[in-house]
Amino acid sequence: MGRSRSRSSSRSKHTKSSKHNKKRSRSRSRSRDKERVRKRSKSRESKRNRRRESRSRSRSTNTAVSRRERDRERASSPPDRIDIFGRTVSKRSSLDEKQKREEEEKKAEFERQRKIRQQEIEEKLIEEETARRVEELVAKRVEEELEKRKDEIEREVLRRVEEAKRIMEKQLLEELERQRQAELAAQKAREEEERAKREELERILEENNRKIAEAQAKLAEEQLRIVEEQRKIHEERMKLEQERQRQQKEEQKIILGKGKSRPKLSFSLKTQD
């Protein structure tokens, strides 16, 4: 068991050191590439400066030489001659020669400028080609490094994908929980509202029942009162009727002579043989 642990630890250390060495070598190669590109750009800049300096020196030497030549020609020129029009011949010829020299100098300057522009165009093309090749080389190096680190990159991508998936799942669960809580709160609010409405309806029903009961009680009392009044009226009528009958009997007694005021009358029926 101890040997296997030591071997695994040594292997892990070896892999870690190899990875560290690879990273170090990659960083060194990148720094070397950057240093090469920097040196090349510096050398190109120094070449450009040297060319500019040589051009300026050549211009100054050309102007000095042309001045010396003009001075020599003036010194070696014969005395002025006069033509039929009274003009000096030497001056006219010198003017023509001067114009020719100026034209030649202009042509030479134009050619020199054309060569300079051509050289600058070529230098620019060389710089662009160099930059393109450097870019291709860097892209190739990057591709090689990516190919070397393909498995590591794939593992890192998978790790990030899994991490993003976990985060999304967590966010989704949290969102579902929030929705569930919101639905529960809404359901509770609805139930509370329904309960309040139900209680209000029950209260209204109780109030209506109470009012109906009170109305029924009042109606029953009123009916009892009416019945009692009707009974009293009936009793009063009965009493009045009895009193009337009594008075009528008394009057009849008086009329008929009852109470020994008149003799009794006897009525008999004769039977026929």
From Swiss-Prot:
Residues 1-113, 238-273 are annotated as: Disordered. Its main location: nucleus. Induction: Post-transcriptionally regulated by autoregulatory feedback loop. ARGLU1 protein binds ARGLU1 pre-mRNA and stimulates alternative splicing to produce two alternative RNA molecules. The first includes an additional exon between exons 2 and 3 and is rapidly degraded by nonsense mediated decay. The second, a stable intronic sequence RNA (sisRNA), retains the entirety of intron 2 and is able to bind ARGLU1 protein preventing it from stimulating alternative splicing. Transmembrane segments: none annotated. A motif (LXXLL motif 1) lies at residues 172-176. A motif (LXXLL motif 2, degenerate) lies at residues 201-205. GO terms for biological process: mRNA processing; regulation of alternative mRNA splicing, via spliceosome; RNA splicing. Residues 1-74 are annotated as: Necessary and sufficient for RNA binding. GO terms for molecular function: cadherin binding; pre-mRNA binding; transcription coactivator activity. It is found in: Nucleus; Nucleus speckle; Chromosome. GO terms for cellular component: chromosome; cytosol; mitochondrion; nuclear speck; nucleoplasm. Keywords: Chromosome, Coiled coil, mRNA processing, mRNA splicing, Nucleus, Phosphoprotein, Repeat, RNA-binding, Transcription, Transcription regulation. Residues 1-29, 37-58 have a biased composition (Basic residues). Residues 66-84, 93-113, 238-253 have a biased composition (Basic and acidic residues). Residues 75-273 are annotated as: Necessary and sufficient for transcriptional regulation. Residues 93-253 form a coiled coil. The modification Phosphoserine is found at S58, S60, S76, S77, S266. Dual function regulator of gene expression; regulator of transcription and modulator of alternative splicing. General coactivator of nuclear receptor-induced gene expression, including genes activated by the glucocorticoid receptor NR3C1. Binds to a subset of pre-mRNAs and to components of the spliceosome machinery to directly modulate basal alternative splicing; involved in simple and complex cassette exon splicing events. Interacts with MED1; the interaction is direct. Interacts with PUF60, U2AF2 and JMJD6; may interact with other proteins involved in RNA processing and splicing. The N-terminal region can bind RNA; preferentially binds 5'-CGG[AG]GG-3' motifs. The non-classical LXXLL motifs are not required for nuclear receptor coactivator activity. Belongs to the ARGLU1 family. This is Arginine and glutamate-rich protein 1.
